[in-house]
Swiss-Prot record:
Residues 48-59 have a biased composition (Basic residues). Pfam families: Ribosomal_S21. PANTHER family: MITOCHONDRIAL 28S RIBOSOMAL PROTEIN S21 (PTHR21109), SMALL RIBOSOMAL SUBUNIT PROTEIN BS21 (PTHR21109:SF22). One of its GO terms (biological process) is translation. It comes from the Bacteria. PROSITE patterns: RIBOSOMAL_S21 (PS01181). GO terms for cellular component: ribonucleoprotein complex; ribosome. Belongs to the bacterial ribosomal protein bS21 family. Residues 60-71 have a biased composition (Basic and acidic residues). This is Small ribosomal subunit protein bS21. Residues 48-71 are annotated as: Disordered. InterPro entries: Ribosomal_bS21 (IPR001911), Ribosomal_bS21_CS (IPR018278), Ribosomal_bS21_sf (IPR038380). One of its GO terms (molecular function) is structural constituent of ribosome.
Amino acid sequence: MPSVKLKENEPFDFALRRFKRSCEKAGVLAEVRRREFYEKPTSVRKRKAAAAVKRHAKKVQRENRKFQRLY
């Protein structure tokens, strides 16, 4: 859990902004959204497999773009 200590003579808005930034970096909101509803283990596996396929297709497309002629 991210925590922020209020510095001396620091406005609350700045501390709040630092806290929000640290929460974003820690991935707190993404984790909350992911755990908002129960997801069956089969759905988790299916989603991860689909993401892997998408990543692979993106990688192949990026590699093919290197060899494409520009004339």
